[in-house]
Structures are given as C-alpha cells and as structure tokens.
C-alpha cells in the first residue's frame, strides 16, 4: 500500500488559483449531491427488483449525509456552501431519466439501465472525491479531507453493491423477450 505525503499549504497556497479551483470543484460536487437527493427517489420508484429499490433508498440517506458533510467542509475552510451546476452529473441524471422513459415498467431491462446510470454517477463521485481529498491535503485542510474520505468510502460501497445487484439483473434481463 503506497502512502501519499501531505505537504501543508503555505498562506500563499490558500490564496492561490489552486484554492479557487478547489472551491469551484466543491461547489460542483455539492450541486451534484443535491441533484442526486432529488433523483434517487425516482430511481427507487422505477426499479423493478426490491433489492435495487432498497439500494437506491439506502443510498439516498447516505447522499443526504454527503450534502451535510460538504456543508461542514465548506465551513471548515471558511467558505459559504454554494452550488455550481455540475454538467457531468446533469448529463448522467438526464441519461437515467431517458432510461426510465425508454424502458418498460417492471422489467429487469429497466433495472440494468438504472444500474448503469447509478454506477456512472458513483464513478463520477468517486473520481471527484478522490481528487478533492488530495487537493484538501495539499492545501492543508485535513478536516475537509477526513470528511470527504468518509464520503468516498460510502460511494465505493454503493458502487460495489450496484455491481453485485447487476449480476442477477443482467441474467434476468437476458431472459426477457425482445419487444418489436
């Protein structure tokens, strides 16, 4: 296991373009998490399998906690919690809504599509939190890094759970007849 050294930031670093970028990326993921709080109930309702429905409902509770954690992060770095529209998450959410619109109710095929959309969201969040944690450490924001590390671990677990559910959903969907 490799370790990453964290070099505390100087006063200059905290007033740098890197600091500005860090705050913009926090605003981006803050918007994304808030969007998911609104979207996950729709995904849960559209899910065919009870296991997938429960996974989305459980992750909704975690996502609400992620929003709260981000508010703590903003506070810990002396910034007010503001959002900046996350175009990546907006696109992923739109794709998920299209899947719901374009698939039949109560089918495993819909679940497969919802899992794809869910995992795309998770992977975006995993990448974003991974980068933000390193920036926080570089800038000397250890409390922010700890808060986001807890969120990152939950995102990884949610992704793993979706991967597990996909195995049975994919098999079930492969048995559904093709509609003409």
Model-derived regions: residue spans:
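Amphipathic alpha-helical hairpins
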Residues: 1-180
């Amino acid at each position: 296991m490799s370790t990453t050294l964290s070099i505390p930031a100087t006063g200059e670093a905290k007033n740098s373009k890197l600091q500005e970028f860090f705050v913009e990326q926090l605003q981006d993921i803050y918007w994304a998490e808030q969007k998911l709080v609104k979207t996950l109930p729709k995904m849960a309702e559209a899910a065919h399998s009870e296991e997938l429905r429960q996974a989305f409902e459980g992750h909704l509770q975690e996502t609400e906690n992620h929003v709260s954690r981000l508010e703590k992060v903003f506070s810990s770095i002396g910034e007010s919690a503001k959002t900046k529209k996350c175009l990546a998450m907006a696109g992923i959410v739109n794709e998920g809504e299209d899947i719901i619109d374009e698939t039949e109710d109560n089918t495993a095929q819909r679940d497969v599509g919802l899992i794809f959309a869910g995992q795309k969201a998770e992977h975006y969040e995993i990448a974003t939190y991974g980068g933000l944690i390193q920036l926080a450490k570089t800038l000397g924001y250890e409390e922010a890094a700890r808060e986001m590390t807890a969120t990152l671990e939950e995102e990884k677990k949610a992704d793993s759970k979706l991967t597990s559910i996909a195995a049975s959903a994919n098999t079930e969907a492969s048995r559904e007849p093709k509609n003409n």
